[in-house]
Amino acid sequence: MAGSEGVSGSAIAAAGLRVQQGRLRVMTENLANANSTASTPGGDPYRRKIAVFEPVGADAEPTGRVVRDTSPFRSISRPGHPAADAQGILKLPNVNPATEMAGLRAAMGAYESNLKVIATLDDLNRRTVDLLKI
C-alpha cells in the first residue's frame, strides 16, 4: 500500500480504541442527562450529542468532533414544574435511552475487537521473536 509504510497494526487498532472511547464518553453523557430539565422556566434542556469521526488514511490519526443533535425535544404537560413554560409544558432532552444503549453496545464491541487485534499482534510478535532465537 502506498503511503502506509511504517504504520503498524497496533497503531491502527490503538486509534480505533481512541475513537470508541470518544463515542462511549458522549453516549454515557447523553444517558446521564436523559431526564434532566432546563434550569429556567421554558428553557431548553440538555441536547443530545453525537460523536462524528472523519475517515482517514491508515497513516493518519482519526479526527473527530462532537455535534448537537437538532431533533426536537420531547415535551410533556407538567404545570407547576419549575422548568415548565407559561402553558405548563416541560421540555425534556431529545435523548432516547434505548438508542444510546444500542450505541454503547456497538461501541463496546468495536472497542473489544480493537483490543483483540492488539493482543493478537502482540502474540504474533512474541512468537516471531521466539522463532528468531532458535
Feature map (PLM): residue ranges:
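Amphipathic alpha-helical polymerization modules
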Residues: 1-134
